[in-house]
Swiss-Prot record:
Catalysed reactions, semicolon-separated: guanosine(1207) in 16S rRNA + S-adenosyl-L-methionine = N(2)-methylguanosine(1207) in 16S rRNA + S-adenosyl-L-homocysteine + H(+)
Descriptive protein name: Ribosomal RNA small subunit methyltransferase C
Protein's UniProt keywords contain rRNA processing: yes
Native species: Haemophilus ducreyi (strain 35000HP / ATCC 700724)
Key word RNA-binding present: no
Length: 329
């Protein structure tokens, strides 16, 4: 099934005839299969491991250096993430590079005109399915400096480093703050700890700094988050393993604590499947006596899921907006 963005691209198949194509950005479907027969080559690059892990022809990573006659970028709601990906790839190309940018209007795709107009000619060529499609031709190669995209902030003695797409990238969010406050010196954490959906790594790094005896693993689906968490550990001289995993897809160990501030937004839509998978599968990755501790908006229907998976749960602490839940094996 094609996304709305790919449905718009499918209205312009002659643009792909005989060309080498690169699909990148927030690619979420198999539009590539529709254009293979008319293109000379189709490559796919993704920052999203939950997509890339399902297909052998998708390259997962941070920076894309794949050349193509025509780049096709799928816009996402995070503008800084889009800026990073577009400018990084265009800085590797040559004058005359052709590109299509497709995105939903509600995700702010219109701002691509302001972003790319200093570097060439950009024009909207279609508007359908609540999306905008733009054509761009490069006239001035942008100077890409990755360091300009890194942000940092302090949490007590901890320095958090992050790239745009990492959750908690510019400050500690209220949910994570409540979650961290739920850990006291009485917890005396030891053993294996997993920070699942780690974002910039603030939760796992904070726990490792406060409880040095733990063996820390952090995971996320986004390459920017993985690099951010690695940088946060290195900056604070902390040890830990950071891996790409779609919930538990690439996690084989068992843990004494699984901690998470799980996402419930999929791009600009609300989706609960990730948290459902986390709660329902966590028991299989906990040692006997192990704990799952998560924070969530108070209105979300997670208590029933926790009771279904674990038999019972506790509310460790709460605020007007969030609750911290605990469930044990």
């Amino acid at each position: 099934m094609l996304s709305l963005k790919s449905e718009v691209l499918a209205r312009h198949l002659p643009l792909f005839n005989g060309k080498s194509i690169l699909l990148f950005g927030n690619v979420r479907d198999r539009f590539a299969d529709q254009i293979r027969s008319i293109s000379s080559h189709v490559a796919i690059f993704s920052h999203y491991f939950d997509y890339a892990r399902h297909y052998n022809d998708v390259e997962f990573g941070l920076d894309c250096t794949t050349p193509a006659n025509l780049g096709v970028f799928y816009w996402t709601k995070n503008k800084q993430e889009c800026h990073y990906q577009l400018l990084q790839w265009l800085s590797q190309t040559a004058i005359g590079q052709q590109m299509l940018i497709i995105g939903e209007n509600r995700a702010g795709v219109r701002s691509v005109e302001k972003l790319l107009s200093p570097f060439g000619q950009i024009a909207k060529i279609d508007s359908a399915r609540r999306c905008g499609l733009y054509h761009f031709e490069l006239q001035t190669i942008p100077q890409f400096d990755c360091q300009k995209f890194w942000k940092s902030y302090r949490l007590a003695d901890l320095t958090v480093l992050s790239l745009p797409a990492a959750f908690s990238s510019t400050e500690l969010d209220a949910g994570s703050q409540l979650l961290l406050s739920s850990f006291t010196n009485q917890d005396r954490l030891t053993g294996n700890v997993l920070d699942l959906g780690c974002g910039a790594g603030v939760i796992g790094a904070y726990l490792k700094q406060r409880f040095p005896a733990i063996s820390l693993t952090m995971s996320d689906i986004h390459s920017m988050a993985i690099h951010s968490a690695q940088a946060t550990l290195a900056k604070n001289k902390l040890t830990g393993t950071v891996i790409a995993s779609d919930v538990f897809s690439h996690i084989n160990d068992r843990f004494d604590l699984i901690v998470s501030n799980p996402p419930f937004h999929d791009d600009i839509d609300t989706a609960y499947h990730t948290v459902e998978s986390l709660i329902m599968q966590a028991k299989n990755h906990l040692n006997y006596g192990g704990e799952l501790r998560i924070v969530a908006n108070a209105f979300l229907p997670y208590p029933d899921l926790l009771d279904k998976a674990f038999g019972s749960h506790q509310v460790v602490t709460k605020s007007n907006k969030f609750k911290v839940y605990s469930a044990r094996v």
